[in-house]
From Swiss-Prot:
This is Pantothenate synthetase. The gene is panC. Keywords: ATP-binding, Cytoplasm, Ligase, Nucleotide-binding, Pantothenate biosynthesis. It comes from Bacillus cereus (strain B4264). One of its GO terms (cellular component) is cytosol. SUPFAM superfamilies: Nucleotidylyl transferase. The reaction proceeds by a bi uni uni bi ping pong mechanism. The keyword Nucleotide-binding applies.
Length: 282
């Protein structure tokens, strides 16, 4: 595995690889890798001749009161996970390398961002789309892999890749969970022991809602209220949102049918956790 820290070298490597006909699987991350990321890397390894992993904590996608400065970082750990999962190139640029001057252009996302995390985190998805536009231009991937834990992010990325005719295939990968159901996340390290137990109720609330839908409930308000009430009863966390939308358009639905997403965000003392399920309802 080769570690690359400059844009120029990474672009030279990937342009030569593509010119020689090699397929490139790209996994963009902010580091502090866990089994969810490893799953993305393994899928990229299965489907491509070359695997590129980026580790970059992108300041553009953090708001003024968010956890940019304390976001967990451990490049030695990330290198080990990368090697264990067959990464060929680890792209590890500094902030100064990625943003050497003040940005004169950003990618403004006008759809799919006014709900869920986009509503709570203004500017977040513009930051995500901007850094991905840069990373796609740097790594020139054949396929790019994203976890469905950030399902809104996946919907936004699919939209902007289509809108800008970016020649990359977006590959969504199912949420990876701990044995007890908690969605794997780099931010889980912020949970206290008691909060870690309470956090299990996030996925349980979604499973209960899924059972109600499968039993025939089609009123979205009843489903979302069920989720909110369950979380508020079983945790000390604050429900940021518990919403149901059509997916991937993220538009309101009057009836639970077609492909839908039921998504939640819950604030604990030192961390905000998200989770979701997507269903196709007939």
């Amino acid at each position: 595995m080769k570690i690359v820290t400059t844009v120029q070298e990474m672009q030279q490597i990937t342009s030569e690889l593509r010119a020689s006909g090699k397929s490139i699987g790209f996994v963009p991350t902010m580091g502090y890798l866990h089994e969810g990321h490893a799953t993305l890397l393994r899928k990229a390894r299965e489907e491509n001749e070359i695997v590129v992993l980026s580790v970059f904590v992108n300041p553009l996608q953090f708001g003024p009161n968010e956890d940019l400065d304390r976001y967990p970082r451990d490049i030695d750990r990330d290198e080990n996970v990368a090697k264990e999962n067959g990464v060929d190139y680890l792209f590890y640029p500094s902030v100064e390398e990625m943003y050497p001057a003040e940005q004169t252009t950003t990618v403004e996302v006008v759809k799919r961002t006014d709900v869920l995390c986009g509503q709570q985190r203004p500017g977040h998805f513009a930051g995500v789309a901007t850094v991905l536009m840069k990373l796609f231009n740097i790594t020139v991937p054949t396929r790019a892999y994203f976890g469905m834990k950030d399902a809104q992010q996946v919907a936004v990325i699919e939209g902007f890749v289509t809108d800008f005719n970016i020649p990359v295939t977006i590959v969504p990968v199912d949420i990876v969970r701990e044995e007890d159901g908690l969605a794997k996340s780099s931010r889980n390290v912020y949970l206290s022991q008691d909060e870690r137990e309470e956090a299990l109720h996030l996925y349980r609330s979604l499973c209960i809602a899924k059972e109600r839908i499968e039993a025939g409930e089609r009123n979205p308000e009843i489903i979302t209220n069920l989720v909110k009430d369950y979380i508020e009863t079983h945790t000390k966390g604050t429900v940021d949102y518990a919403d149901l939308y059509a997916y991937p358009s993220l538009t309101m639905v009057e009836k639970v049918e077609g492909r839908i997403i039921l998504a939640i965000a819950v604030k604990f003392e030192n961390v905000r956790l998200i989770d979701n399920i997507t269903l196709t309802v007939k």
